[in-house]
Every structure is written in structure tokens, then in C-alpha cells.
Amino acid sequence: MFPSPVTTTPFSVKDILNLEQQQQGGLAPMELSSPSCMLATFKQEAFGSEPPALPELPEPPPAKPPAAFPGPYYVKSYGEMDTAKDSKADKKELCALHKSLEQEKRELEDPERPRQRKRRKPRVLFSQAQVYELERRFKQQKYLSAPERDHLANVLKLTSTQVKIWFQNRRYKCKRQRQDQTLEMVGIPPPRRIAVPVLVRDGKPCLGESSPYSSPYNVSINPYSYNAYPAYPNYNSPACNANYNCSYPAVQPVQPSAAGNNFMNFSVGDLNSVQPPIPQGNAGISTLHGIRAW
């Protein structure tokens, strides 16, 4: 190795160049040495000095077998995983997000601009042959099962949804027709005509000139006759209007008992001895005007 010159600045250009030269000079003898010399030195080091014996180490425990996982989850290693699909999905999400942001930006810029209406699906137009076949099948069967609907759709070259919607609309149309027919059969009764008297004509009351109002039902109201009782042949009517005077015999006073208590003692015979007076005249008069004689 060459002695390094004394330098005042260790980071000067000369110092850097001298360091490179020293590294090249140290590597040169190793490169020029023959391989036979290198082999001899290696053999001397290998047989001349034996390494110290290492202490015996315990044998490592046997490795546990890896846990059995289902195959579909570990088919590929991490290096073999396909990242192309993930990148495509990320690109699609970014594109959708970008479009939504642009749409919101446009709405904010033009708030008065009406939003675009969603385009409706075109209406399905059935051919005459398809309509004829559908009508013929509807007359036979108003409700179809799923296999029958699929078979009919394949025959008519339609989708199962189109056949289903057509049958729904046809059932609703048939129901409306039945409702209209029932309304026509029942009909609405004509309005009643009611006679109303004219009270004012040309600004003048016409109650006196008009004929008296007649009831549409021609019901005559008569005063209730009170003399509707049947006449008796043996009695005149003045006798019916006569006042009745009933006289009852006085009850004998009951003498108090010797004991002087507050109770009254009387017998049932005293009550039966009192007889009601017999009014003058026949008993039929007592039934007049709801009056009963006791």
C-alpha cells in the first residue's frame, strides 16, 4: 500500500483521486496471483488449523404439517395473483366517480337547467298473429303457470315477462268491461219532480192570487171527534155528562187498647163490612170516559 500524502483538506479533489488509486493498488496483487497459489493457501488453512469443536445442540423438533385449507382459497400464490382484474375494476370505479362529479358540477353551474328525464323503454308492439294467439289462449285460460308461460313465449318468440304483462293487462281490461256492463244494466232512476208554489213574481208577492197549495198525496186532515162513543138506547147523552157523587160510610173509630200501646187493633171483618156504594144507573155508564166506580 502506498503511503497517503499529507493533505490539509480531506475532501479535496486530489484526496479523492488518491483514495481511488489506493483501492486499485490493493486489489491488483490479488487479481495477478495464480489460482494454484490460492489453492495451496486454502489447503494449508484447512488442514493446518482445525476449528474448535462446537457443543452439541439438541435436535430441532419436527416441523408441524401445514394446516389443511380448502383448495379454492389457496390455488395461486401471491406472485401468481392476477392484478389485471383489480386494475380494471379500479379504473371503472374512477370513471364512474369522475362522471358523477362532472354531473354535479354541471348542476351547480346551471341550477335553472331542467334535469334530463329518463328515457322510457320502447313499447312492445305485438304482431297480429301474436295477438290472435294470445287472445285465443286467454279465452281458454286466464291464468298461466310459469312453465306454460315459458312455452307460450317460446312459441310466439316473446319473453316470459312480455307474456305475463300482456295477460295482466288483458285481465284488467276484462274486469273494467264487466263493471261498465253492470252500470248500464242497473241504470240511474230519473229525478223526482216536486211542485213548488210561486211566492214572488216580478217582484210582487203572489200568495193571494195563487190557489191554495194542495198536498201531492191528497190527505185530508179532520179534527178528532170526541163524540165517537156508541150511544146507549136506555140512556140519554145528558146523563153521561152528569157528575157522580160517591158517598162512603164513615169508619167507626177504633178504641185504643187498655195497654196503651201505639199499635191499632182491627179485624179483617171490619174491612169487609165496608161495601162500596152502588151508583145509580146501569154499570155500562161506568166505562164511559175511562172512569171506573169503586
UniProtKB/Swiss-Prot annotation:
Classification via SMART domains: HOX
Protein name, per record: Homeobox protein Nkx-2.5
Region annotation (Disordered) ranges: 48-69, 102-122
Disulfide bond entries: none
UniProt cross-references to SUPFAM superfamilies, sorted A to Z: Homeodomain-like
Family: Belongs to the NK-2 homeobox family.
Localization, UniProt: Nucleus
Presence of keyword DNA-binding: yes
Family matches, as InterPro entries: HD, HD_metazoa, Homeobox_CS, Homeobox_NK-like, Homeodomain-like_sf
Keyword Nucleus set for record: yes
Biased composition (Pro residues): 52-69
GO biological process, one term: atrioventricular node cell development
Gene3D superfamilies assigned: Homeodomain-like
Chief location of this protein within or outside the cell: nucleus
Record GO terms (molecular function): chromatin binding; DNA-binding transcription activator activity, RNA polymerase II-specific; DNA-binding transcription factor activity, RNA polymerase II-specific; protein homodimerization activity; RNA polymerase II cis-regulatory region sequence-specific DNA binding; RNA polymerase II-specific DNA-binding transcription factor binding
Keywords assigned by UniProt, alphabetized: Developmental protein, DNA-binding, Homeobox, Nucleus
PANTHER family in the cross-refs: HOMEOBOX PROTEIN NKX (PTHR24340), HOMEOBOX PROTEIN NKX-2.5 (PTHR24340:SF28)
Lineage, highest ranks first: Eukaryota, Metazoa, Chordata, Craniata, Vertebrata
